[in-house]
Amino acid sequence: MDNKPRRDRKIDSGKRRYLPSSERKQEILDAAFEEFSRWGFLATSLERIATRAGISKSGIYAHYPSKDAIFEDILVMALVPQDSHSTLLESGTTDLSEILDRYLDRIYATLGSQQAIATFRLLVAESGRSPDFVQRWGRKLLEHSLVGDRGFLDACIERGIIRADVSLDQYLLAGAPSALWLVLMTLFGAEDNPVSLQQVRPLHRRLLLELLEPK
């Protein structure tokens, strides 16, 4: 089941429905996204989220300890690939080109989704209302992503697939094409994006190969 926030789903608050935990959490995330988009994070209360989701405030606490935890879940589910990159090594291959192709498939499928673009728009809007808040969450999101990336890089180094002296800073900079592509997708949409996936992905791949390939 898709565990990312679905922005287009209307939540019926007229009658309490008993749902599995995963579905209830999904409704909370959908409701929270709508409220955050309308009012901003600071002005949105758990009561507003509960009302839109059609549950009580205590119903939210059964799944999330705070509004911050809800916001973090929205960001991580929309902007960070849900499967660990280390799963790319499960086939046993040591071919760096093959691994990178599968890695980029995962990255661009995540960042090109409507959920990711809508969430990035929310972050941009929120940065005007409360820049300190967005910087804090941006750092948390980056840390969450880099922890997984570090584990992936270490596993590749252990297998002799990539250079042993690759730093996370270098790896982050090599990912700049995907960040630019997400910004342009957010600004222009898929139809009018001046930089196509067919242009940006080969550049991203080449930068990663130059950085990671054993010398």
Roles of regions detected by a PLM:
Residues 41, 64, 124-130, 140-141:
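Short helix-capping/turn signature of helix-turn-helix
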Residues 28, 66-72, 81, 133, ...:
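Short amphipathic alpha-helical segment with a characteristic S/N-K-E followed by hydrophobic residues
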Residues 74-103:
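Amphipathic alpha-helical linker/stalk segments
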Residues 1-39, 43-55, 62-69, 94:
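Basic, helix-initiating cap at the start of DNA-binding domains
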Residues 98-129, 178-180:
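Helical hydrophobic small-molecule/effector-binding pocket
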Residues 135, 154-207:
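Hydrophobic/aromatic-rich alpha-helical bundle segments in the mid-to-C-terminal region
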Residues 110-113, 118, 131-158, 202:
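Amphipathic alpha-helical packing segments from all-alpha helical-bundle domains
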Residues 210-215:
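C-terminal effector-binding regulatory domain of bacterial HTH transcription factors
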